Curated annotation (Swiss-Prot):
Its EC number is 5.4.99.22. Pfam families: PseudoU_synth_2, S4. This is Ribosomal large subunit pseudouridine synthase B. Residues 317-334 have a biased composition (Basic and acidic residues). The gene is rluB. Residues 420-451, 490-501, 509-550 have a biased composition (Gly residues). NCBIfam families: pseudouridine synthase. Residues 28-97 form the S4 RNA-binding domain. Residues 294-550 are annotated as: Disordered. Responsible for synthesis of pseudouridine from uracil-2605 in 23S ribosomal RNA. InterPro entries: PsdUridine_s_RsuA/RluB/E/F_cat (IPR042092), PsdUridine_synth_cat_dom_sf (IPR020103), PsdUridine_synth_RsuA/RluA (IPR006145), PsdUridine_synth_RsuA/RluB/E/F (IPR000748), PsdUridine_synth_RsuA/RluB_CS (IPR018496), RsuA_PseudoU_synthase (IPR050343), S4_RNA-bd (IPR002942), S4_RNA-bd_sf (IPR036986).
């Protein structure tokens, strides 16, 4: 073998290739390219160009200028690149319900038709004509701006068919033939003459009539204004056909269906547009562009400060963890909001940073300059009370809230009883003998205690306005209602005529025999004495008398 090194040919290892001839770039008017992208009508876009609101390659655009593929266009803070259409046109049929507007963004927050449409990549839906918020029916949308402009332009005379329900003018039962004739010939509206190319009565009732109408223009609310010019009121309006495309019967409201590609090609041929994919420019959004970051202003004791809240990163997931710490919690000190003594808000730190902050921020000194609060009050702060003892209830050293002297013979009146002057209770008999145990009624109306009978717990039942506490049962002290009655029957009966109850009738009511209302010195009543009351009077009823049945 020869030791001579082999020389490699550089031509064989070259990665260069013969470049193909560059295709000529498309060039179109700027307002046409913007309309092709669905950013508005050509007339409105021309006005925006004249106002200097659009830039091309960093310079303010001029009216009538052209752009080529690859140019950068800025509009409303967004950046686009002009590029040729490579996909075929698509057309969508949407059955619009009431309550939706045909705009991309509504300042009043109403729902739009674009919220219910399929999502596109690299293009956008363009509405072919508009329907107001109360009009329903067929709405066509396309990705081809040239097709949309041709179908909307009056020079192409594309038919729009509507079904309308009309109320006759006031004082008339139905829409007259004279009104139909005038609308067929044409009437003068605010923006010029208008007419129905076709009008046909298709039904009606006693209150309204149904018509089928056809127009070849797309003015704002043209169908409604034509009927209103004759004094009629439109109560229902639905579009059923646009050109050769009709609304499918099976398509529900709020739903959409895409038109077959062969029908789209036929529609373009009918409008005398070129076949295949349209050789036109459109706008593609710049990938990865950042919108203006939203910010908020925090007003604190030190003044105003801006804070980053939520920037649009066009799908950058790695920024989520960083955005979590954008909103900082403010740790307030003892001074509170708006007080000069409080600590400043910020992050909670520890370690060396906390040590440095403690050296920079000494403790607050008390004194006249800082507003000396004075010495603390003497005594136990817990001894200050924010409640008051009700009248008639005493407090004592015992654990019960109503602690006080208890036992026989206290003779304390019921705090919830109605106090009044003592007097005689009307009745027919003499005084009843003293009860067993010896309690009697004094002149003041209060019940006394004697050594023979203990206090009752609730002799009159629990009053409606009296508080009841669990401790009243757990630790009984003084009870304003009396002590509990001893268990068992009392020793001995109640002396008096007729056994335990008086013989007289005890029907309640003023003037009743043996009864009567309370009152001092009632007629026929004996004066009440200690330990007795008139027989048969008061609240006691004799057996077999009064309201008790035999």
């Amino acid at each position: 073998m020869s030791d001579t090194p082999r020389k490699l040919s550089l031509n064989k290892l070259s990665l260069k290739r013969d470049s193909a001839p560059e295709a000529p770039k498309l060039e179109e008017r700027l307002h046409k390219v913007l309309a092709q992208a669905g950013l508005g009508s050509r007339r409105a876009l021309e006005q925006r160009i004249a106002d200097g609101l659009i830039k091309v390659n960093g310079a303010v655009a001029q009216t009538g200028m052209s752009v080529r593929s690859g140019d950068k266009i800025e509009l409303d803070g967004r950046s686009f690149v002009a590029s040729a259409l490579t996909e075929p046109s698509r057309v969508l049929i949407y059955n619009k319900p009431e309550g939706e507007v045909t705009t991309r963004e509504d300042p009043e927050g109403r729902p739009t038709v674009f919220e219910s449409l399929p999502v596109l990549k690299g293009s956008r839906w363009i509405a072919i004509g508009r329907l107001d918020i109360n009009t329903t029916g067929l709405l066509l949308l396309t990705t081809d701006g040239e097709l949309a402009n041709a179908m909307m332009h009056p020079s192409y005379e594309v038919e729009r068919e509507y079904v309308v329900r009309v109320r006759a003018p006031e004082g008339e039962e139905k829409v007259s033939d004279a009104i139909i004739e005038r609308l067929s010939r044409g009437v003068l509206l605010e923006d010029g003459g208008a007419k129905f190319d076709e009008i046909e009565r298709i039904g009606g009732t006693d209150s309204h009539d149904w018509f089928r109408v056809v127009v070849k223009e797309g003015r704002n609310r043209e169908v409604r204004r034509l009927w209103e010019s004759q004094g009629c009121q439109v109560s229902r309006l639905k579009r059923s056909r646009y050109g050769k495309i009709s609304l499918p019967r099976e398509l529900l409201r709020g739903h959409s269906v895409e038109v077959a590609q062969d029908k789209v090609d036929a529609l373009r041929a009918e409008l005398k547009l070129e076949e295949g994919a349209p050789s036109a420019l459109t706008l593609q959004p710049v990938i990865g562009q950042r919108r203006a970051a939203k910010s908020t202003v925090h007003v604190s004791r030190d003044g105003r400060s801006n804070a980053y809240v939520n920037g649009q990163t066009s799908g950058a997931d790695e920024g989520r963890e960083l955005r979590r710490f954008d909103n900082l919690r403010e740790d307030r000190g003892r001074g509170g909001r708006g007080k000069p003594g409080g600590f400043k808000g910020g992050l909670t730190v520890s370690g060396e940073a906390a040590a440095r902050q403690s050296q920079q921020r000494p403790f607050k000194q008390r004194g006249p300059a800082k507003g000396d609060r004075g010495a603390l009050p003497d005594g136990n702060p817990a001894a200050f009370r924010s409640w008051y003892v009700p009248d008639g209830v005493s407090t004592g050293p015992s654990g019960h809230r109503n602690a006080g002297p208890s036992g026989p013979g206290t003779g304390q009146a019921r705090p919830y009883a109605k106090k009044g002057p003592g007097g005689a209770r009307p009745g027919t008999g003499g005084p009843v003998g003293a009860r067993s145990g010896g309690p009697g009624r004094g002149a003041g109306g209060g019940q006394g205690q004697s050594q023979g009978q203990g206090q009752r717990k609730h002799p009159y039942g629990h009053p409606g306005n009296a508080p009841s506490f669990p401790s009243d049962h757990a630790n009984p002290g003084f009870n304003p209602y009396g002590a509990a009655r001893p268990a068992g029957r009392p020793s001995g009966g109640r002396p008096g005529p007729g056994g335990n109850r008086g013989p007289a009738s005890a029907n309640r009511g003023p003037g009743g025999p043996g009864g009567g209302a309370r009152g001092p010195g009632g007629p026929g009543g004996a004066p009440r004495g200690p330990g007795g009351r008139p027989p048969g009077g008061g609240n006691r009823r004799p057996p077999g008398g009064g309201n008790r049945g035999r």
